[in-house]
Amino acid sequence: MNNTPSHPDIPALVADLARARLEARPLPWPATVPADVPLAYATALAVRAARSEQGDAPVGYKVGFTNRTIWPRYGVYGPIWGTVWRSSLVQIDAAASNEGVISLKGLCEPRIEPEVVFGLREAPPPDCTAAQLVAAIAWVAHGYEIVHTHFPGWKFSAVQAVADGGLHGRLLVGHTVALPAATEPEALIDALAGLRLKLYADGVLKDQGLGANVLDGPVQALLHFVRELRATPGAPALRAGDLITTGTLTDAWPVQAGQRWHTEIAAAGPLAGALKGLAVRFE
């Protein structure tokens, strides 16, 4: 692990972020804060350390803005990443129906993002290939990340999104599909890139997406993240058991308490009939 960079602005930025999260209020930052990407990630890592010391625990990572089709809408033109927390994660038991309940309490302007989620059986080797990465994946699942922002109207810069926890709010992970270590890499890569998804709100079709929307496929998005994480000063190393989201297959849609959203999924290859649609109710 590299040493986390220090900067005189970090303590004040961390304090602002803590207040915004705990009080669900906007951040009082001008467009020039943080000053750059390294400072934004250093701030996010300082928040991670402080929140861990307070008793929460990181369980993995979210990768955002991998969907090139939405870059112009948000003014962010490249992927970012943030931490997923034990307190923000809901996993559906394999014995239960593939439907979960998420509380929106404490979130600011929440939106729903249907995603592909991976769980690691081991840390992939440094500078891994796609095949080595697939061998390190224990399971794949469909999930929803509920993103939110402390910048009113979803108006922020890329560096502000990074500092603001990568916009992570909640994560619902549906039934997992186990991947044997001998899974054929190209078959999985192609199946996920070709995945088709329909997103419904209270029974009404809202959007449609493709696996290929996220950097040409979820495995490709995961590979990009693995390399970016290693290149970030002070970032933690990946561990067995980490889960990683790979970005929304559709646009991010506003949600509110009382709604029920669900997806329909069409997948081929090793995921045919295994990766299923997911429902969520909001409170």
Name these PLM-found stretches:
Residues P5-A235, A272-E283:
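Catalytic-core "active-site belt" of small-molecule-metabolizing enzymes
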Residues H168, A240, R260:
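Active-site lining segments that contact anionic ligands and/or coordinate catalytic metals
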Residues D190-A191, V255-A257:
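Short glycine/proline-enriched turns and hinge-like loops at secondary-structure junctions
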Residues A201-G203, T246, A266:
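Short strand-turn-strand beta-turns centered on an Asx-Gly dipeptide
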Residues A221-Q256:
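A conserved acidic, glycine/proline-rich C-terminal tail/linker
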Residues L249-W253, A267-A272:
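Short, charged beta-turn/beta-strand-edge "cap" motif at the junction between a beta-strand
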Residues A257-A268, V280-E283:
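Short, compositionally biased
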